[in-house]
């Protein structure tokens, strides 16, 4: 530890400095070392591993985290390659997955192998749009209806106000909802290759000022939870948020039997009774086996917002036993991804995006984020097929035992 880091830690413990004030005293690396020193002294923890990180401390402190103390590392594996024909992604892809769940990468890898043996999966982004829904206070429902009508009649003016804050985002629609003396306006934006949450928030604040200037409505909060961000929500399942993407594949029966030791009919029954009926009985918004596993692992590997796995797991898996084949699909209703900004600028996350060939802005704009969404959807499909097959063949517990997990 540098002497100055130790001295700074002394000052923190003496009450002369707060942890967040260390950034004003020195560079980010030294400030992080000082924070680790404070933690070691006050908790008796060993923080050597926290201090062994590969990213640039100054960049991380400026853009990613406050009170930078170190780095958290996760094992990263790759599944694939998996063949994919999409609207933006086309070819064979290795899927980088950061996880601590043993057997997950092996599970997805097995599904990828079957998909590729079948000639590859199809994938399409069918809807895009990051949303933000401010809530306004009005006198009563009559006034609320008038504000909602004003919003419907003045979409162009709202777009001009919102788009004045960004050179990339475009307002695509505004949907009003009136609940008593509350008016919610759900703004939807095309944020191109950015995940776009910050962009949408800043743009919506500007549009909300126009609403207040032109109507009796008073802004209470720029987010009224009808967006809906980082929470399970039916509106995201129905209307979508981020990217709505579907992947599907038809796998010949002989491939199913050879690779999974089961039949298309058995996999279909497992899906119907588990993912559809079981999920309905549970009141689940996710009618799938474990789509969140793949979404979370790829999100961590590629620098996405990990909390938005909540929306990403909003998925429906369908399976049909067709003539001598298995048809399977996964629809992810609200997958929020980006290939620019945020965590995508960190070095290991940049490399993972490079493995997929989608780092940075796409040509046309939005193409790289679309491609990432399609790749994740195919990865989720691979995971769904393999887990359902393992359940149908009663091999799930044996697979975990074989891998020592």
UniProtKB/Swiss-Prot annotation:
Activity regulation details: Is competitively inhibited by lovastatin (formerly called mevinolin). Lovastatin also blocks the growth of H.salinarum, and this effect is reversed by addition of mevalonate, indicating the critical role that the mevalonate pathway plays in isoprenoid biosynthesis by these archaea.
Cellular-component GO terms for this entry: cytoplasm
Quaternary structure note: Homodimer.
Annotated organism of origin: Halobacterium salinarum (strain ATCC 29341 / DSM 671 / R1)
Key words, A-Z: Cytoplasm, Isoprene biosynthesis, Lipid biosynthesis, Lipid metabolism, NADP, Oxidoreductase
Subcellular location per the Swiss-Prot or TrEMBL entry: Cytoplasm
SUPFAM superfamilies assigned to the protein according to its UniProt record, in alphabetical order: NAD-binding domain of HMG-CoA reductase, Substrate-binding domain of HMG-CoA reductase
Database matches in InterPro entries: HMG_CoA_Rdtase, HMG_CoA_Rdtase_cat_sf, HMG_CoA_Rdtase_CS, HMG_CoA_Rdtase_eu_arc, HMG_CoA_Rdtase_NAD(P)-bd_sf, HMG_CoA_Rdtase_sub-bd_dom_sf
Function: Catalyzes the NADPH-dependent reductive deacylation of (S)-3-hydroxy-3-methylglutaryl-CoA (HMG-CoA) to (R)-mevalonate. Cannot use NADH instead of NADPH. Functions in the mevalonate (MVA) pathway leading to isopentenyl diphosphate (IPP), a key precursor for the biosynthesis of isoprenoid compounds such as archaeal membrane lipids.
Residue numbers annotated as active site: 101 (charge relay system), 305 (charge relay system), 400 (proton donor)
EC number: 1.1.1.34
Pathway: Metabolic intermediate biosynthesis; (R)-mevalonate biosynthesis; (R)-mevalonate from acetyl-CoA: step 3/3
BP-aspect Gene Ontology terms: coenzyme A metabolic process; isoprenoid biosynthetic process; sterol biosynthetic process
Main EC class the enzyme belongs to: oxidoreductase
Reaction(s) catalysed (UniProt annotation): (R)-mevalonate + 2 NADP(+) + CoA = (3S)-3-hydroxy-3-methylglutaryl-CoA + 2 NADPH + 2 H(+)
Family the entry assigns: Belongs to the HMG-CoA reductase family.
GO molecular function: hydroxymethylglutaryl-CoA reductase (NADPH) activity
The protein's name in its UniProt record: 3-hydroxy-3-methylglutaryl-coenzyme A reductase
